[in-house]
């Protein structure tokens, strides 16, 4: 369900893993998710000794899953070669799906990046040391996100949380594979040095959000023939966490979402306005197989005092399954505050708001791929100067069948931006109720802006003393005991 919410529509069953259950494929059928199914060989293993047993497993698996409409593609291995006779067997048993020998052939290049990089490198297409990766189809492209502080506390002792115990954190990051105690920490510190794990984890969500947004939006920009390079898609590596780790993704092993889920969902909405940190341009993406004419995209820029210092609009005609690239350029005023904010609004020809987007940006110059500099990466210390804001919250609870819902309406009643707010549905012990499904989270509100969010969970997950919490960068936390 989180996958469906994120907007991701193709899942890779990696060759080092398994063939999923019938229930998994049934869910993919129902949710409209496609599956890239690899068989059980990887580049770091040998071919099986018992070929007959292997081919028997391929046959039984294909017979079991071939009638699922979600099954899109067969791949014989991950970064290896095929067992002789595999394509012939697949043609005999199915013959209706595409096939390739391994994950990095037939015009599909090898993957990366996997670790933390400067988010500016996604726009520049220098994130991989192997060369250009924002082109064609990429089978492995991704970045980490720190889990929420509640997950971190469940993962290790308080003494190892803060100050960060590098040995423990690296152990929980595959011997430091994703660079969480090095580059990720350095980038988090560009939001200001933290004095507690709570503060560090909050800033870690900001970096995770930028990681995801920069990846998906640069691929949006280069969709098909519309951008600087031809891009047909990517498989996010890796999609889920198979164990507790400090390098999370859109959600943690325990099904606790991170900011990356909601910023990915925003980036992959079917009609989407987006900003390019390298070009300072605004583009509009259309994933529908129909065109839309006379849409209006508006870009607003606010300084650190929430004063609007720039606003410009452009009328765009959106081609079917296409992109209106560089519809307008944002001209940041001379003397603008070191940290500032960008609000994008997309409206249809009748003036109805279709979507919106929000960014934080610094004046720091990008000095190249060997640095941790740039307007998406550094110079955010002045966020600590953001003045206090106020958000008025009202909610209603309802029940439908076995599920419990909290419908929340929020409005920024101040003249200051309410930055990076998080809703939480907690039990009496102030631990997150999991899984709970939020229609949005980790969001910002401009002065006067209104927002609605619905939280859903199973009734069986509820307990006495359930709490609704709203907290944020520059608002006082609010707590409500739900009945």
What are these regions (language model features)?
Residues 62-169:
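Active-site region of glycoside hydrolase catalytic domains
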Residues 288-305, 413-432, 471-473:
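Short acidic, flexible loop segments centered on an aromatic residue
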Residues 256-285, 302, 363-401:
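Low-complexity, acidic Ser/Thr/Pro/Gly-rich terminal tails and inter-domain linkers that flank the onset
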Residues 1-110:
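Active-site mouth of glycoside hydrolases
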Residues 386-443, 454:
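C-terminal accessory/binding modules appended to enzymatic or scaffolding proteins
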Residues 330-381, 456-483:
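Terminal connector regions
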Residues 295-297, 303-337, 433-460:
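Intrinsically disordered, low-complexity Pro/Gly/Ser/Thr-rich segments with frequent PxxP/GP/PP motifs
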Residues 126-302, 309:
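Substrate-binding clefts and catalytic carboxylate motifs of secreted carbohydrate-active enzymes
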């Amino acid at each position: 369900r989180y996958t469906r919410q994120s907007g991701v529509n193709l899942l890779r069953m990696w060759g080092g893993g398994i063939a999923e259950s019938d229930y998994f494929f049934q869910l993919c059928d129902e949710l409209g998710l496609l599956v890239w199914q690899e068989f059980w060989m990887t580049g770091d293993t040998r071919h099986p000794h018992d070929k007959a047993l292997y081919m028997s497993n391929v046959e039984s698996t294909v017979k079991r899953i071939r009638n699922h409409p979600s099954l899109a593609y067969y791949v014989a291995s991950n970064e290896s070669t095929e067992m002789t006779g595999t394509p012939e067997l697949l043609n005999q048993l199915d013959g209706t799906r595409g096939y390739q020998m391994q994950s990095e052939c037939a015009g599909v290049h090898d993957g990366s990046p996997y670790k933390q990089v400067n988010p500016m490198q996604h726009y520049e297409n220098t994130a991989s040391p192997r060369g250009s990766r924002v082109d064609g189809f990429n089978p492995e492209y991704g970045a980490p996100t720190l889990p929420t502080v509640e997950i971190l506390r469940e993962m290790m002792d308080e003494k190892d949380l803060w100050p960060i115990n590098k040995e423990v954190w690296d152990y929980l990051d595959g011997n430091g594979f994703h660079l969480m105690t090095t580059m990720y920490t350095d980038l988090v510190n560009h939001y200001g040095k933290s004095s507690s794990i709570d503060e560090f984890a909050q800033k870690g969500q900001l970096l995770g959000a930028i990681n995801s947004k920069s990846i998906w939006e640069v691929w949006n920009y280069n969709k098909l023939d519309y951008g600087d390079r031809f891009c047909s898609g990517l498989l996010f590596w890796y999609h889920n966490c198979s164990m507790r780790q400090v390098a999370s993704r859109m959600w943690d092993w325990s099904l606790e979402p991170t900011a990356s889920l909601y910023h990915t969902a925003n980036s992959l909405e079917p009609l989407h306005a987006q900003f390019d940190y390298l070009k300072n341009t605004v583009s509009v993406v259309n994933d529908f197989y129909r065109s839309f004419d006379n849409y209006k995209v508006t870009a607003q820029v606010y300084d650190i005092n929430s004063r609007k210092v720039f606003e410009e609009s452009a009328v765009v005609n959106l081609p079917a399954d296409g992109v209106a690239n560089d519809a307008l350029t944002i001209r940041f005023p001379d003397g603008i505050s070191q940290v500032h904010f960008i609000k994008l609004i997309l409206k249809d020809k009748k003036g109805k708001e279709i979507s919106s987007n929000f960014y934080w940006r610094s004046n720091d110059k990008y000095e190249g791929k060997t640095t941790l500099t740039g307007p998406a990466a550094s110079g955010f210390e002045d966020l600590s100067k953001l003045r206090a804001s106020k958000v008025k919250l009202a909610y209603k609870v309802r029940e439908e069948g076995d599920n419990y819902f909290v419908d929340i309406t929020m409005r920024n009643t101040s003249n200051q931006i309410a930055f990076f707010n998080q809703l939480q549905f907690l039990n009496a012990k102030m631990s997150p109720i999991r899984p709970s499904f939020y229609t949005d989270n980790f969001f910002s509100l401009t002065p006067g802006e209104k927002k609605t969010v619905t939280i859903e969970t199973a009734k069986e997950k509820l307990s006495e003393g359930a709490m609704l919490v709203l907290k944020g960068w520059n608002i006082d936390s609010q707590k409500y005991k739900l009945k």
